[in-house]
């Protein structure tokens, strides 16, 4: 399954952009939940895709912060 944005594209983002992208995806997830509750959602597969993207971005964010705090 090919996502609209891949992990390679996420790795190019800096920490501020990652945070903005996470916020945007969480808003999208909220909107999907609202549509599902009102029975307007036909594309339930988007839950899995967005959750996976959020998890990937959170992992990248933690890795970047760990690499910045670790002395070489």
Swiss-Prot record:
One of its GO terms (biological process) is translation. GO terms for cellular component: cytosolic large ribosomal subunit. SUPFAM superfamilies: Ribosomal protein L29 (L29p). GO terms for molecular function: structural constituent of ribosome. Gene3D superfamilies: 1.10.287.310. Keywords: Ribonucleoprotein, Ribosomal protein. It holds the Pfam family Ribosomal_L29. It comes from the Bacteria. Belongs to the universal ribosomal protein uL29 family. HAMAP family: Ribosomal_uL29. This is Large ribosomal subunit protein uL29. The gene is rpmC.
């Amino acid at each position: 399954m090919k996502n609209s944005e891949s992990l390679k594209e996420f790795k190019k983002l800096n920490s501020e952009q990652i945070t903005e992208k996470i916020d945007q995806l969480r808003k999208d997830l909220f909107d999907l939940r609202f549509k599902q509750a009102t029975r307007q959602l036909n594309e339930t597969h988007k839950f899995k895709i967005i959750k996976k993207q959020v998890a990937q971005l959170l992992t990248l964010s933690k890795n970047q912060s760990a690499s910045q705090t670790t002395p070489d």
